[in-house]
Structures are given as structure tokens and as C-alpha cells.
Amino acid sequence: MSPQTETKASVGFKAGVKDYKLTYYTPEYETKDTDILAAFRVTPQPGVPPEEAGAAVAAESSTGTWTTVWTDGLTSLDRYKGRCYHIEPVAGEENQYICYVAYPLDLFEEGSVTNMFTSIVGNVFGFKALRALRLEDLRIPTAYVKTFQGPPHGIQVERDKLNKYGRPLLGCTIKPKLGLSAKNYGRAVYECLRGGLDFTKDDENVNSQPFMRWRDRFLFCAEAIYKSQAETGEIKGHYLNATAGTCEEMMKRAIFARELGVPIVMHDYLTGGFTANTSLAHYCRDNGLLLHIHRAMHAVIDRQKNHGIHFRVLAKALRMSGGDHIHSGTVVGKLEGERDITLGFVDLLRDDFIEKDRSRGIYFTQDWVSLPGVLPVASGGIHVWHMPALTEIFGDDSVLQFGGGTLGHPWGNAPGAVANRVALEACVQARNEGRDLAREGNEIIREACKWSPELAAACEVWKEIKFEFQAMDTL
């Protein structure tokens, strides 16, 4: 029997190409509590109407393709298709629109950030009808949130593990980031922890290079942790970077860290990938390890205002995939971060319920139900003069991380750590006494300098250092 080559009109299938908006633009649609909602910033090519552009995004990120196909008739597109349900122009921008798309929950595998992103931010970002496309925000329904473990432990459990309350945690990234031997690296870790820091950190690109193999680093850092704990009576930690070329090697490093009895490991979640990150987060919960997350590569994805993925989406994805800390920008340091927008996604990381607030870039109300919170990490170009602002901006549930601002102290690493700890304790005490950190911050630091020569020396070195550039990440 030869295959059928002709189609009769009565079959109901009409081959060819039709406008996306005929199927995927549905302004009358009422969103469901179970829908994943997305806000895209869409820049259509000249001559492409916004309705067609928004519908194309909905189609290409869900069930659509460039032409009608026979197999459309074998399923229910009304049940599974994405829908562009609202479009609004972007104020102050020509030919840019916020297009809202609703996705049925059945399109996504449970507990998989990888699958969710493969659909929503997949091939559609290379679509020719669009000049540029940026995912500004996602609303994750509670039905989907509950399919994720999320952070291995969360903020309160971490505080209980560390026995540290009522203040931000203090950290330091060991510098130079590359080139130190394992023994010298461990020495720097010890000096910083002995001086008063809670944590030290592997830089994100420290994995297992010829000058310092991972096992040697882990051993010397563990020795530094135990020695500093014995001398200070405080629980200490070092973010041992378990990121590796394969998931198997990553897990081997995490297992060795657990065997050493250290409290925390680290992962570069964007370069390492969401599948690897989620696997590591599950291991960390099962084995009592905290998980510090670095966002290396994020600016490639999120820095351009009209194309890519906003970091608030990457932050939500991390909370779902799993991490106890994540770098979030500083507002005041050397790296990108506008205050209101930064605090918007900081709240998305920490709080259980966040109301829609467009002034802070939050497009949807988000309910995290029982998913634990994540500590934001302020890191990058910060020093003791920034301490009042950081304490006021980020509050107690944060990690303030000074790399060069510790190791660059003129008297050495331990005095650098002392200076940061004294500055933090002074700011917390002043705040608790009702003083205004934003207005009196410099005075508070100067007062503390009178009884801390280490802090006075740090203040003298960095008194003129500022990073005053306009933020790219604006509303």
C-alpha cells in the first residue's frame, strides 16, 4: 500500500503558515493559580506588531512551531499552549513592550529548573522576529514550588548550626584568587578566621589547578578551620569550592568535605549547571553541609537591559534548585547593583511571601510556602567605610564579604579581619541603640577607630576609595 500523498479538505488539517497571534494571543484569558507566569521585555523587529511578537514568544516557548503540523490534531493545544494574555509598552522606551505569558503547569517536569528554563528561555531567544528579548520575572505557582527541595538548610537552620545571631555574618574571599600554594592558602584562611571572620571563601575560579589541587586545599583549609575554632571559641567555615568538570567529580569533592567535618561547601551554579547544583543541594541536606552559591557568568546573562534574563529570575531559580547563600551585589561596591532592584530580589531570596511591587522590579506576587530562605551575600569592592551602609541596607540576614577589604590591610590578614569585625560590631551596636546608620555611619566608624588601631589603619588606607558609576540595571 503506497503512502497517502493527498489530503482531503474534510480532514480539517490545513497546511501552511499562519500568524502566531491567531492562536497564542489571548487577551481574554484569565490566569490560573497553577500557571507559571512570565514577564518578557520584547523588542520586535521593525514591522512586527507587538501582539504577533508576544504571541510568537508564547508559541515558541511552549507548543508552537513555524508552520501548522499534522500532529497538532493528536493533542489538545488549548490545554498545553502558552498564552500571551497582556501587553503593555515600556515607559520611556521606543518599540519595547512587556508581554505577559501564562504557561500550563503540565508543560514542566516536577522539581527541574533545567526543564523549566529549557522551555521558557530556550530557542525563543534566537527568534528572528524579535530584535531582543529579556525575561524580567517569573511567578512560580505554589503547586510547582512544592515539587522542589530548595535550599539545603535555610537561614534559621544555618544560624543554629553556627550559633550566631543578631548580626550579619562576615566573610572574606582569599586573594590572590589564583596562584597560591595550598599551604599558603590555608595560612591566609587561618589568619582571617582567627582575626574574627565567620567564613573565608574559595574564589569562584579556584577548582583544582596545577598550583593547588583540590584535595590539598581542602586539607589545609580544614586545619585552619579547626585551629581558629579552638583559639576563638567560635564556629568557623571556609567555602570549599566543589565545582568540577563532571558531576561525579563534584560529588567526590563534596563527600571529602563532609568526611573532613567542615560545615560548608560551594558551587558555581551557572557555570556548573542547574542539574549539578540541584544534585549537590540534595546531598548537602542529606549530609548536614551548608551550600554557598557563586553566580559566576551571571552578567553575561543579565546585564543588558533589553536582552537576556534578569537576575531576579536567576535568584528565584537558585532558591528552587538549592543554595544557602548566593552573591547578590552590594549596591555600594565595585559590581553592578541598583538599590531598589537589588533589595527586590534580596527579599525574593529571603522572605516567604513577596507582594508585587513594580517600583522594585517585582512583576508578580510570589508565595514560597515552606521553601527555606537564602542568605544574600554582599561582595565586591567593599571595605570598612561601607560597613554602616551594608548593615543598614542588608540587615542581619546577610553575609558581608570583604576580600581585598580584608587581605589588603596594611598590617596583614588578621588585622584586616579584626578591622572588619570591629566595624561590624560597632554598626550593630549603634543600630541597636537607635542611631541612624545612613546619616551617622562615618561618625560611628570614626568613634570605633579610637579603640581599634586595626580599624583606624584600614580607614586611613581606604578613605578615598569609591566606585561611582551609573548602574546598568535600572527600571
Curated annotation (Swiss-Prot):
- Please name the GO terms of the biological process aspect recorded for this protein, alphabetically: photorespiration; reductive pentose-phosphate cycle
Species of the source: Oenothera argillicola (Appalachian evening primrose)
Q: How is it modified after translation?
A: The disulfide bond which can form in the large chain dimeric partners within the hexadecamer appears to be associated with oxidative stress and protein turnover.
- Tell me which residues bear N6-carboxylysine: K201
PANTHER family of this UniProt entry? RIBULOSE BISPHOSPHATE CARBOXYLASE, RIBULOSE BISPHOSPHATE CARBOXYLASE LARGE CHAIN
* Catalytic reactions on record: 2 (2R)-3-phosphoglycerate + 2 H(+) = D-ribulose 1,5-bisphosphate + CO2 + H2O; D-ribulose 1,5-bisphosphate + O2 = 2-phosphoglycolate + (2R)-3-phosphoglycerate + 2 H(+)
- What does it do? RuBisCO catalyzes two reactions: the carboxylation of D-ribulose 1,5-bisphosphate, the primary event in carbon dioxide fixation, as well as the oxidative fragmentation of the pentose substrate in the photorespiration process. Both reactions occur simultaneously and in competition at the same active site.
Protein family per UniProt: Belongs to the RuBisCO large chain family. Type I subfamily.
| Protein name in UniProt | Ribulose bisphosphate carboxylase large chain
Query: Residues of the signal sequence?
Result: none
Q: What is this protein's gene name?
A: rbcL
Upper lineage is: Eukaryota, Viridiplantae, Streptophyta, Embryophyta, Tracheophyta
